[in-house]
Design a protein with these regions (language model features):
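Conserved catalytic/dimer-interface elements of ABC ATPase nucleotide-binding domains
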Residues: 137
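Portal/gating segments that form or line small-molecule/metal binding sites
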Residues: 1-132, 142-183
């Protein structure tokens, strides 16, 4: 079975949405290398509808000259989890809608190979709750923004995890990798 790796840019206060705050920290080579290592094994990209609709116009016209990440996002099959979007392929090539969230369907996709998830906080919460995330990569930026969507919102269930790795990056970002809690 393939691995499911999640990538989130987050603030120290846990906010993961509208990450324009990342721009203040640049995109140094060590950050690019960390993300490259995370995405390299991906045979598919799993996205929630909202993230898909934000990524499609941003990535679909980019070339490798614009951004080294463009081939990953444009050439890799994208699976969109949505109960409302039915024709993802007409929005962004190599995209397919897989229907509303279904843990069994995600397991089937994992059987086909490694999956990469970026953003998609609602989807990620469900994946974590169902034990489908093998690696949760949090790129923690040294800023608190005070409000916004959190990956693990207040009032959510207790979610124990195990630290798999920690890396300090040159721009002050901490790359923390977590996996399912071990007994």
């Amino acid at each position: 079975m393939g691995a499911l790796r999640v990538h989130e840019f987050t603030t120290v206060d846990g906010v993961v949405d509208a990450p324009m705050w990342t721009m203040d920290y640049g995109f140094p080579d060590d950050l690019a290398a960390s993300i490259g290592a995370l995405t390299a094994p991906a045979q598919g990209i799993l996205l929630g509808r909202t993230t898909f609709e934000m990524f499609a116009p941003a990535w679909s016209t980019r070339t490798v000259e614009d951004d080294p990440g463009a081939p990953l996002f444009n050439d890799t099959t994208k699976y969109v989890v949505s109960s409302t979007l039915t024709d993802a392929g007409s929005v962004w090539r190599n995209s397919t809608a897989v229907g509303g969230y279904d843990a069994g369907r995600i397991r089937e996709l994992k059987e086909q190979g490694d999956l990469y998830v970026s953003g998609s906080a609602t989807l990620v919460r469900a994946l974590v709750a169902d034990g489908l995330v093998d690696e949760l990569h949090l790129f923690v930026y040294p800023v608190a923004v005070g409000s916004g969507i959190r990956l693990f919102p207040e009032g959510g269930p207790r979610t124990p995890l195990s630290l798999l790795g920690a890396e300090g990056l040159s721009n002050g970002v901490a790359h923390l990798t977590y996996g399912p809690a071990t007994a």
